[in-house]
Each structure stands twice: as structure tokens, then as C-alpha cells.
Amino acid sequence: MGRSLKKGPFIADSLLKKVEKQNTDNDKSVIKTWSRASTILPLMIGHTIAVHNGKTHIPVFITEQMIGHKLGEFAPTRTYRGHIRDKKGAKS
């Protein structure tokens, strides 16, 4: 179930202020954020936002197709290292 239209999309206040400040200054430097739950808005297009994945910040370049999605969707938190292989010559 999605968020109520009456409430509007969630975006962290600090992130919104940083994006708006960069838009007024015509600056496109990387913005670091821990807010994975923030929704991508049209005013973020063209910005690079470094989203925290629990260990490091992963840079995400915002495009038009990402609008409406959450920042956390583009910064995976788990690494898949493959299934464990059976030992050679092991008896079952």
C-alpha cells in the first residue's frame, strides 16, 4: 500500500535543503545522505546523491525514470558471493 496523496511524498528536510541550495547555486557536487527512505523528486534530476548502504556511500545519478522511487532502491545493502560449492570427492 502506498503513501496517502494527502500527506505527499517523504523526503528528509536536510536532503531537500541541500538539493534546493545546489539548484539555486547551479552546483552539481555529490550530496551525501543516510536517508534511504527519501522519495526521488523531479527537482533532483541531474544530481548525484551518495546513498549509504550500511557500510559505504554509493553514488547514484538521478534520471527521469527514477522519479517516485526511493533512494534506497538504488543502493543495495547485501552482497551475493555465490553458493558454497561442494568439496571435491566428498561422500554423501
Swiss-Prot record:
Q: InterPro entries under this entry? A: Ribosomal_uS19, Ribosomal_uS19_bac-type, Ribosomal_uS19_CS, Ribosomal_uS19_SF
GO terms in the biological process aspect are:
ribosomal small subunit assembly; translation
Keyword RNA-binding: yes or no?
yes
What Gene Ontology terms describe where this protein resides (cellular component)? cytoplasm; small ribosomal subunit
Keywords attached to this Swiss-Prot or TrEMBL record, sorted alphabetically, are:
Ribonucleoprotein, Ribosomal protein, RNA-binding, rRNA-binding
Q: Which GO terms describe its molecular function?
A: rRNA binding; structural constituent of ribosome
One Pfam family of this chain? Ribosomal_S19
Q: Does the keyword Lyase apply?
A: no
Q: Which NCBIfam families match?
A: rpsS_bact
Q: What is the stated purpose of this protein?
A: Protein S19 forms a complex with S13 that binds strongly to the 16S ribosomal RNA.
Question: Which HAMAP family does the record associate with it?
Answer: Ribosomal_uS19
Q: Which family does it belong to?
A: Belongs to the universal ribosomal protein uS19 family.
* Protein name (Swiss-Prot/TrEMBL): Small ribosomal subunit protein uS19
